[in-house]
Amino acid sequence: MEVKDILKTVDHTLLATTATWPEIQTILDDAMAYETASACIPASYVKKAAEYVSGKLAICTVIGFPNGYSTTAAKVFECQDAIKNGADEIDMVINLTDVKNGDFDTVEEEIRQIKAACQDHILKVIVETCQLTKEELIELCGVVTRSGADFIKTSTGFSTAGATFEDVEVMAKYVGEGVKIKAAGGISSLEDAEKFIALGASRLGTSRIIKIVKNQKVEEGTY
């Protein structure tokens, strides 16, 4: 698989709590230069970022992040506010307390409400796979499919672990037609990125791939 094809799947990500505007600018510049799928940044930077890229790059942001236990009304407002400010894609975190209580209907209804708030914008649902049993993950594949969301996403990158090959395999087997998979968290090599894609992921959330590509270009004397 060519590097440029891997880069097209990447949501180039900076969600650090201490991220500065110059750091966000670098993320945006690199994402545009390497033609990634989007740049994923904190909601507080969305308006400024959207103005900065001026339609040359999709802007993704996160809501209910990273713990997911804010109310549905709060998440809906976050979504509407982000879109008003120029976000093209929304990555939401589900409420894991509902999952652990076995209340999957509430999880589904929340996703439906946020999808309605997204209108025609892309919605990715973060299920935080490292906190789930296999049975819970399988159930959530059905929930996300029925909800009308566009993607199921493995991880926030802020919990105990990120994406695993095994979890993406489960998602690919049990998610419904029309729902795509985003693997995120801990993707640190082009080889891993390619394997996640081969297993069924069509988006990768990572901050490292562009750095790897840059280093390769330096080593090859082409950058």
From Swiss-Prot:
EC number, as in UniProt: 4.1.2.4
InterPro entries associated with the record: Aldolase_TIM (IPR013785), DeoC (IPR011343), DeoC/FbaB/LacD_aldolase (IPR002915), DeoC_typeI (IPR028581)
Entry GO CC: cytoplasm
GO molecular function: deoxyribose-phosphate aldolase activity
Coarse class of the protein's main subcellular location: cytoplasm
Reaction equations catalysed: 2-deoxy-D-ribose 5-phosphate = D-glyceraldehyde 3-phosphate + acetaldehyde
Active site (UniProt): 91, 153, 182
One BP term from GO: deoxyribonucleotide catabolic process
CDD domains: DeoC
Record key words, sorted: Cytoplasm, Lyase, Schiff base
Pathway field: Carbohydrate degradation; 2-deoxy-D-ribose 1-phosphate degradation; D-glyceraldehyde 3-phosphate and acetaldehyde from 2-deoxy-alpha-D-ribose 1-phosphate: step 2/2
Cellular localization per UniProt: Cytoplasm
Function: Catalyzes a reversible aldol reaction between acetaldehyde and D-glyceraldehyde 3-phosphate to generate 2-deoxy-D-ribose 5-phosphate.
HAMAP family: DeoC_type1 (MF_00114)
Family to which this protein belongs: Belongs to the DeoC/FbaB aldolase family. DeoC type 1 subfamily.
NCBIfam families: deoC
Name the record gives this protein: Deoxyribose-phosphate aldolase
Protein's organism: Streptococcus agalactiae serotype V (strain ATCC BAA-611 / 2603 V/R)
Taxonomic lineage: Bacteria, Bacillati, Bacillota, Bacilli, Lactobacillales
